[in-house]
Amino acid sequence: MPSGFVPRHPSLEDAYALLTFPRAPKTANRLASPPSDVSDASADDPPERPVVIRADGIARKFGNFVAVADTSFEVRRGEIFGLLGPNGAGKTTTFRMLCGLLVPSKGQIEVAGYDLRTAKAGARARIGYVAQKFSLYGKLSVEQNLRYFGRSYGFFGQALQDRIDASLEDFGLTDRRDTTAGSLSFGAKRDLSMACGLIHSPEILFLDEATSGADLASRRAFWRRINALAAAGTSVVVTTHFLEEAEYCDRFLIQDAGKVLALGTPREVKQRAAVLCAVSGQSLVVDRMSIEDAFVAIVEAGRRSQETPS
């Protein structure tokens, strides 16, 4: 078994995928080359990887409403980091602050070595962003969309054309390069949106509900691509409503009511859930626990603690 992988019990979804899906070809993006400071350290030793995102005591208020409260964490080079939580938990607000789309009410965020308070433009040049509602120009062709985003990141001439051609090939869009983005299927729009987000070989990729509306085959293909990007040194921050997809993250954070309830690897989060269940007289076995089981246990324990008088 490759290093960094944690075994888990197969699910019905796994069986369905094995029985019905053909083996996928390579999905690595040729534009995603490892940064020069990436070492050969295995996924078992992430502390040796440099920190690319640092959130230190960040919070966000809207009037008197606290959307995110005193949140701190780090994301390292080549790490897949997930943000999970129920609706209204604060994960989208946290995500938007990391992207520079929202300013924290307090605290500090560093992205790719840049303080977002003072050097937002420098950070944005090093990140890619794929929105849930694809940020494409429907009346422009596939190639024109790629050209627009490539130019916005400072690429021109043959260097830009090489990146466009590589993106078209990597995402299987070569035959549709002259097709307008608005006429593409949902899956092709998602692929084009990903290609636009990666056209400049970003150090960090932000994915907002990227598998929302996708079928199982498309979701599996998406995660194969994300794993290939991470292996090449790209850090990935993802929000998702599919709890089972947290298994594909190196680490993830669970929020509710703006507060961090758990942070760690899938196994560490399950262990946290098992401890919380034991305290309340329930029993969950880590090796038989799904991410959904852990998520429900942690969120329910967090809500009980808020209801208990201090």
Q: What feature does the model see in each segment?
A:
Residues 107-115, 122-123:
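Conserved ABC transporter NBD signature motif
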Residues 147, 151, 158-176:
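Conserved ABC ATPase "signature" region
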Residues 205-209:
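Catalytic Walker B motif of ABC-type/P-loop ATPase nucleotide-binding domains
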Residues 263-264:
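ABC ATPase "signature
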